[in-house]
Amino acid sequence: VPSRLTQEEANDVTLYAISLVGTPYRFGGNTPESGFDCSGLIGHVYKTRARVAAPRTVAALIDWGQPVPAPSLRAGDLVVFTQKGVTNHAGIYVGEGRFVHAPSSGGMVRLDALKSKYWSQQGVSYLRP
């Protein structure tokens, strides 16, 4: 599946996303200083590390990239969650079955496993920007 990102940019996106773990959650936030919501985190990381502008809402992310089958998932891809047909959350895949995201619960940017009890029960799509 083609990508807007070079391999180096995908690596930069991944490392930078991991470095933001612990940044506070803030609805509408899109900078490390203000805090992040999930789409704000994605937009900030892709803009600063790959010079690619991501949509500002999580609902718009579903149309932003190319669908990727789970076995082809690679670091820098997007993980997009859907509940009852509504796209409601997203994060950045960082490899080894893990993703970085800004959930409203927990109050900060976190690194979580896709196979965790909660996330494995959510509808998920994988996208390559």
Positions of PLM-derived features:
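Catalytic cysteine-centered active-site loop
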Residues: 1-4, 23-75
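Compositionally biased, proline/threonine/alanine/serine-rich low-complexity intrinsically disordered stretches
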Residues: 1-19
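ATP/adenylate-binding site constellation spanning eukaryotic-like Ser/Thr protein kinases
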Residues: 18, 22, 96
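Solvent-exposed polar/charged
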Residues: 19, 47-48, 92
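Structural motif
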Residues: 76-77, 97
